Structure formats: structure tokens, C-alpha cells
């Protein structure tokens, strides 16, 4: 297996499969607006996920369930306008694909047409197989999502690690293989044991991107607000914080407010 890194001017679904076959890890982060997406893309992140986690970090909801298709399209279109290199993947939100394959296709088409995104992501396995096939048959690239699927939080009752038991682990492997067979270009595995994630990654040729799934998969994804330390209340075991922006931003904004109160801002050099 080659470890030579290819310089991709534009990441495509084909690029990601090549990266896996060449042993090159895939980086993936969320973004929900133009400015953040521009920074993420300029930094060289391969895949930019417009996640339904916007429901949490942008709108303040406790779960991902409330965000609507219209809201996802708004966020996605903002991101797409900023991105020049990365592959933009958009979550189909809860309620936009679960009822039947035709609804799933309509939702996916709206995202692609109205935002200009490059692919969609759906949560689930065999239970949404027909919806995935319907979307793929329309020429829309699909990424799967298995393990802890946040849209099913009320079914699980907890955000704890999934697929610890043999039966659930076997189903997860079968679902991952099904996703590859029907034509998905990749799959996200969330919060499952590292050894199981490795088995999945080794059993399929499409990239496996982990979040809380160990280091033996083909790439990693995090929510950007979490890895930049913009939320002090969320600190799962899998999260590595690269900055403490909550503290730094609070300090900077506090200093600005103090400077305004004291008439220190603006000074003579900051006026026309």
C-alpha cells in the first residue's frame, strides 16, 4: 500500500476512494457558514460536512431533530459559496427521508439543486436501503452513517457507545457492507468500539470516517465548535480540543466592551 500523498486540486468522491487505497487518511470537519467554511477549506480539510449538528451548535437545540430541510439548505448554500477544494456533504435532516424513498429523493434533489452541494449523508442501514438506492439512481452521491445515529436518540435513550453486543456489531458490519454494495462512496461510524470500527474499515473498499471510533479507520470527523473549544460543556472522550476559543473569545469581547465603556476605543488612529 502506497503512502504517497497526491495533491488534489478538488476533492471528489473518487478522490476519497483513491485516498483510502493509497493509505492516506481523510480529514473531515463540520461547517455551517461562509466564513468558517472558507477557513476550513483553506486549511486543507478534505471533506466539509454541513451537519444537522447545526441544530445544536448554531440554534441551541438539545438534539439534531428540530432542524428543517430549508434550514439545512440555507447553511449548505453558505458553505458551498466558500469552498474551492473540499467535498461538501450535507446531512438529510430528520423527517426528510424516513417516510418513503420518494420523499428521500425529493429532499436530496432539493439540497443538490438549491445549495450546490456535492453529496448527501443519511443515518441508518438496511431500513433505509431503498431510499439510498433511489437517491443514488438519480446520480446523487450518498455517504452512510452507522453506529450512534443522533437522529435516533429517543430510540437509543442515550448517547453512549453503540454496538458493544455481538448482535448489534454483526448488524453494523452487514449494514456497512450493504452501503458499499448499493453504491455509497463512504460511511461515518460514530461512537463504536475501535476494534469493531477496524473490522468494518477492513471489510469494505469505501472510506470509513470515524468519530469516536478509534484510529484504525480511514479518516476522522469532528464538529468544528467542539475541536476549537467553543463549547466548554461538551467533552466526550473522543474529543481533542485544539484551541480554547470560548475562553479566548470571551476575553477579547470583554476587553472590547471595557474599551468602549472607558472611551479607549476608538482612539485617534482609529478615526477618519
Swiss-Prot record:
Chain sites annotated for binding 3-methyl-2-oxobutanoate: 52-53, 91, 121
Pfam families with a match to the protein in the record: Pantoate_transf
Domain of life: Bacteria
Signal peptide from the UniProt entry: none
Coiled-coil residues: none
Gene Ontology CC, one term: cytoplasm
Recorded family membership: Belongs to the PanB family.
Protein name: 3-methyl-2-oxobutanoate hydroxymethyltransferase
Species assigned in the record: Flavobacterium johnsoniae (strain ATCC 17061 / DSM 2064 / JCM 8514 / BCRC 14874 / CCUG 350202 / NBRC 14942 / NCIMB 11054 / UW101) (Cytophaga johnsonae)
Amino acid at each position: 500500500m502506497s503512502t504517497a500523498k497526491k495533491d488534489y486540486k478538488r476533492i471528489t468522491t473518487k478522490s476519497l476512494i483513491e485516498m483510502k487505497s493509497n493509505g492516506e487518511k481523510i480529514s473531515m470537519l463540520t461547517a455551517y457558514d461562509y466564513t468558517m467554511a472558507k477557513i476550513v477549506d483553506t486549511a486543507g480539510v478534505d471533506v466539509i460536512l454541513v451537519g444537522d449538528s447545526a441544530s445544536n451548535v448554531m440554534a441551541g437545540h438539545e438534539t439534531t431533530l428540530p432542524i428543517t430541510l430549508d434550514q439545512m439548505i440555507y447553511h449548505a448554500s453558505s458553505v458551498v459559496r466558500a469552498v474551492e477544494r473540499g467535498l461538501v456533504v450535507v446531512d438529510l435532516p430528520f423527517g426528510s427521508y424516513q417516510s418513503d424513498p420518494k420523499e428521500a429523493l425529493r429532499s436530496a434533489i432539493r439540497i443538490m439543486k438549491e445549495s450546490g452541494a456535492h453529496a448527501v449523508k443519511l443515518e441508518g442501514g438496511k431500513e433505509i436501503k431503498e431510499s439510498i438506492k433511489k437517491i443514488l439512481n438519480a446520480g446523487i452521491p450518498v455517504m452512510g452513517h452507522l453506529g450512534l445515529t443522533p437522529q435516533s436518540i429517543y430510540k437509543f435513550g442515550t448517547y453512549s457507545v453503540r454496538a458493544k453486543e455481538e448482535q448489534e456489531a454483526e448488524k453494523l458490519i452487514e449494514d456497512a457492507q450493504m452501503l458499499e454494495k448499493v453504491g455509497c462512496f463512504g460511511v461515518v461510524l460514530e461512537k463504536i468500539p475501535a476494534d469493531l470500527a477496524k473490522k468494518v474499515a477492513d471489510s469494505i473498499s469505501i472510506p470509513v470516517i470515524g468519530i469516536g471510533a478509534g484510529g484504525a479507520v480511514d479518516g476522522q470527523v469532528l464538529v468544528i465548535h467542539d475541536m476549537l473549544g467553543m463549547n466548554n460543556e461538551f467533552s466526550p472522550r473522543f474529543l481533542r480540543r485544539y484551541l480554547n476559543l470560548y475562553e479566548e473569545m470571551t476575553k477579547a469581547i470583554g476587553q472590547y466592551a471595557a474599551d468602549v465603556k472607558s472611551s479607549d476605543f476608538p482612539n485617534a488612529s482609529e478615526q477618519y
